[in-house]
Curated annotation (Swiss-Prot):
<dbReference type="InterPro" id="IPR002876">
    <property type="entry name" value="Transcrip_reg_TACO1-like"/>
</dbReference>
<dbReference type="GO" id="GO:0003677">
    <property type="term" value="F:DNA binding"/>
</dbReference>
<dbReference type="InterPro" id="IPR048300">
    <property type="entry name" value="TACO1_YebC-like_2nd/3rd_dom"/>
</dbReference>
<dbReference type="InterPro" id="IPR029072">
    <property type="entry name" value="YebC-like"/>
</dbReference>
<dbReference type="Pfam" id="PF20772">
    <property type="entry name" value="TACO1_YebC_N"/>
</dbReference>
<dbReference type="InterPro" id="IPR017856">
    <property type="entry name" value="Integrase-like_N"/>
</dbReference>
<dbReference type="Pfam" id="PF01709">
    <property type="entry name" value="Transcrip_reg"/>
</dbReference>
<comment type="similarity">
    <text>Belongs to the TACO1 family.</text>
</comment>
<dbReference type="InterPro" id="IPR049083">
    <property type="entry name" value="TACO1_YebC_N"/>
</dbReference>
<dbReference type="GO" id="GO:0006355">
    <property type="term" value="P:regulation of DNA-templated transcription"/>
</dbReference>
<dbReference type="GO" id="GO:0005829">
    <property type="term" value="C:cytosol"/>
</dbReference>
<keyword id="KW-0805">Transcription regulation</keyword>
<keyword id="KW-0963">Cytoplasm</keyword>
<keyword id="KW-0238">DNA-binding</keyword>
<protein>
    <recommendedName>
        <fullName>Probable transcriptional regulatory protein SYO3AOP1_0685</fullName>
    </recommendedName>
</protein>
<dbReference type="InterPro" id="IPR026564">
    <property type="entry name" value="Transcrip_reg_TACO1-like_dom3"/>
</dbReference>
<keyword id="KW-0804">Transcription</keyword>
Length: 251
């Protein structure tokens, strides 16, 4: 039965990977459509669209899908009218959570997000209830094996960045004001800096310590369920979990 078991495991992993890929396609198509609607269909003149197209390449999306999404955004093709919605609430342990969604039916999405919060021990709140716990930033990831700390810090500041965070083992995290992200990225590219990723994000101003495995497990289930929703683009939370508990959860 060893062969059968191995096949079964591969099938399950492939099904999961395909599902994740399908969800990523949906999320990226929505982002491309909205970016094109708001800033036009030319990626050279629309930095948000350019980054969305790069994300499409990362998930191996066929270019014809990308082009159709752009045309739907610009109105050249008839398509779904998406709107951006933000939800705020609390998770297990009092963790603040912000959910960014893109939807063609706000009522449906709101009901689904509320259900997910309730099912996994959270509580969907009103607009503004937790957003003060985060600040908007642009982040640019640069591989650590390419540059020394001094070198990347000097280049980042010269490019107009606010700071460089060194915590990640693989990447420097260059932080910018949200409005300066695309400009700083372009300045770095002109300097020949290799960029792994650039995106707008929310960074917690304070964190909630989760020190027991049960609460951590509930929180992870809530965050996973939110991210699995087709309308959800990004999920932010201000938790801090000790390495010892994280290792158990991953195990």
């Amino acid at each position: 039965m060893a062969g059968h078991s191995r096949w079964h495991n591969i099938k399950n992993k492939k099904a999961k990977a395909d599902a994740i890929k399908g969800r990523m396609f949906t999320k990226v198509i929505k982002e491309i459509t909205i970016a094109a609607r708001l800033g036009g269909g030319d990626p050279e003149a629309n930095p948000r669209l350019r980054i969305a197209i790069e994300k499409a390449k990362e998930v191996n999306m066929p270019m014809e899908n990308v082009e159709r999404a752009i045309k739907r955004g610009t109105g050249e093709l008839e398509g779904v009218n998406y709107e951006e919605v933000q939800y705020e609430g609390y998770g297990p342990g009092g963790v603040a959570i912000v959910v960014e969604a893109t939807t063609d039916n706000r009522n449906r999405t709101t009901a689904e997000i509320r259900h997910i919060f309730s099912k996994y021990g959270g509580n969907l709140g009103s607009s503004g209830c937790v957003s003060f716990s985060f600040e908007d930033k642009g982040i640019i990831n640069v591989p650590k094996d390419k540059y020394s700390e001094d070198e990347i810090f000097e280049k980042a500041i010269e490019a107009g960045a606010e700071d460089v965070i060194m915590d990640d083992p693989e990447y420097y995290e260059i932080r910018t004001a949200p409005s300066e992200l695309y400009k700083v990225r372009e300045n770095l590219e002109k300097m020949g800096v290799e960029i792994a990723k650039a995106e707008l994000t929310k960074i917690p101003t304070t964190t909630v310590q989760i020190t027991d495995e049960e609460t951590a497990t509930k929180l992870m289930k809530l965050l996973d369920a939110l991210e699995d929703n087709d309308d959800v683009q990004k999920v932010y939370a201000n938790f801090d979990i000790p390495e010892s508990i994280l290792e158990k959860l991953e195990g």
